[in-house]
From Swiss-Prot:
PANTHER family: PROTEIN YOEF. Interacts with PduU, probably via the PduU beta-barrel which is predicted by modeling to be on the exterior of the BMC. Keywords: Bacterial microcompartment, GTP-binding, Nucleotide-binding. It comes from the Bacteria. Its main location: other. The gene is pduV. It holds the Pfam family PduV-EutP. The keyword Metal-binding does not apply. It comes from Salmonella typhimurium (strain LT2 / SGSC1412 / ATCC 700720). NCBIfam families: EutP (TIGR02528). Bacterial microcompartments (BMC) 100-200 nm in cross section are formed during aerobic growth on minimal 1,2-PD-B12 or anaerobic growth on 1,2-PD-tetrathionate medium, but not during aerobic growth on glucose, anerobic growth on glucose or pyruvate-tetrathionate. BMCs can constitute up to 10% of total cell protein. This is Propanediol utilization protein PduV. May play a role in the spatial distribution of the bacterial microcompartment (BMC) dedicated to 1,2-PD degradation, perhaps being involved in cytoskeleton dynamics. This subunit is directly targeted to the BMC. Might bind GTP. The 1,2-propanediol (1,2-PD) degradation bacterial microcompartment (BMC) concentrates low levels of 1,2-PD catabolic enzymes, concentrates volatile reaction intermediates thus enhancing pathway flux and keeps the level of toxic, mutagenic propionaldehyde low. GO terms for biological process: biogenic amine metabolic process; propanediol catabolic process.
């Protein structure tokens, strides 16, 4: 299985998504520091929200097979600049979380923001009702080589 590194703002659902992908019960847990596991690297939202911590994201990205940009479907703006993941030199996917909270037009806008930031493939998910998680797991278990281009 490929190791994912989750990057996204606070409260976007990174930890809930990690718990769902592991088959764990959902419970709120504030991530205080970068948490490593064989399956995932879970980063605190503050690392994205505070640019002086970007170096920690870049360094941690070296240990990941895939970068996962995470943004909730009801987000009002994108914290990711265009080409955000280019310096990480890793294939990137976009995960739109909390899809049960937004209209399709809003979900499309959030997916476009993730594409502009560098996501080569987008997954629409909801940890609450487990929608979209099978597609993410299929991607992670795929034996196909990863590519850095679209």
């Amino acid at each position: 299985m490929k190791r994912l590194m989750f990057i996204g703002p606070s409260q976007c659902g990174k930890t809930s998504l990690t718990q769902s992908l592991r088959g764990e019960a959902l419970h709120y847990k504030k991530t205080q520091a970068i948490e490593w596991s064989p399956m995932a690297i879970d980063t605190p939202g503050e690392y994205l929200e505070n640019r002086c911590l970007y170096s920690a994201l870049l360094t941690s990205a070296c240990e990941a097979d895939v970068i996962a940009l995470v943004l909730n479907a009801d987000a009002q703006w994108s914290p990711f600049s265009p080409g955000f993941t280019a310096p990480m030199n890793r294939p990137t996917i976009g995960l739109v979380t909390k899809a049960d909270l937004a209209e399709p037009q809003r979900i499309s806008l959030v997916a476009e923001w993730l594409t502009q930031a560098g996501a080569q493939q987008i997954f629409i998910t909801s940890a609450l009702n487990n929608s979209g998680l099978d597609a993410v797991l299929d991607f992670l278990n795929s034996k196909e080589p990863l590519c850095l281009t679209k």
